[in-house]
Amino acid sequence: MDDKKMAVNLRNDDLSEETKTLISSLPSDKDSTGINVCKYQGCWYTHHFLQAVLNFQKNFKPQDTNIIVASFPKCGTTWLKALTFSLVHRSKHPSHDHHHPLLSNNPHVLFSSSPRLFSTHMPSHTLQEVLKDSTCKVVYICRNMKDTLETFESFCKGVNFFGPFWDQVLSYWRRSLEDPNHVLFMRFEEMKAEPHEQIKRLAEFLDSPLLRKKKRTDCLEINKTGKLCEGRDNKTFFRKGEVGDWKNYLTPEMENKIDMIIQEKLQNSGLKF
């Protein structure tokens, strides 16, 4: 199966009878917008997203050269996927190329035969069974959870898409400690503060190191206009990308509540925000 056909297959979200039966047995709730969600392998999904996850677990055949970009939603997935695509294909598409694919395409619609590049919001343990016999690489990017909130209430309750946040981030943090050659843990804030050092780190992890003489990291504008094939605007994948923007929205009481939750959930993990 070629990459494009596989992607369509993995997005086929018609609920099977098997999935409907599974959903009836799972913990269920509603998200902040009133959409029905269910908890599968410790993670909350809409019913259609769950079908896609099950399709992935059943049909995906990893290749050792695959690269998977993972994150919680709104943590820099599109940015990291664009950087990863640029790094592994820079011999074919240098950043100064006026016809670079990223100038006219969203990173999420770009396909390449090798290495294949994918992105996901699934937690590490959901990927693990599928990838257990593969040496493919996973790059995870996390971000201060206060800058990723959809709603304060859903975060505190832990009932949000691909959440709870703390369970997902811990799943990748622990995997990166257990298997640093195949799982890289990155931080959005560090990428903003020291882009050259972090991109160098990413390139080395991907076995695509930057030239030693290179003094700076070239910039490449990503296409933020147009629509994807399923009709979603490209701009829906982009936010301000500002570090600390949460201060414009959260009260001191809300900030303290979130800090207390995170301190409790990440206790003794070695991971700090």
UniProtKB/Swiss-Prot annotation:
Q: Where in the cell is it found?
A: Cytoplasm
Pfam families registered for this protein in UniProt: Sulfotransfer_1
Where, by residue number, does the polypeptide cross the bilayer? none
The record's EC number reads 2.8.2.-
GO MF term list = sulfotransferase activity
Keyword match Cytoplasm: yes
Stored InterPro entries: P-loop_NTPase, Sulfotransferase_dom
Q: Does the keyword Calcium apply?
A: no
Q: Which UniProt keywords apply?
A: Cytoplasm, Transferase
Q: Where does 3'-phosphoadenylyl sulfate bind?
A: K74, C75, G76, T77, T78, W79, R143, R239, K240, G241
Q: Which GO terms describe its cellular component?
A: cytoplasm
Q: Where is the active site?
A: H121
Q: Which EC class is this protein assigned?
A: transferase
Q: Could you tell me which PANTHER family the record lists for this protein?
A: SULFOTRANSFERASE SULT
Family according to the record:
Belongs to the sulfotransferase 1 family.
Q: What does this protein do?
A: Sulfotransferase that utilizes 3'-phospho-5'-adenylyl sulfate (PAPS) as sulfonate donor.
Q: What is this protein identified as?
A: Cytosolic sulfotransferase 4
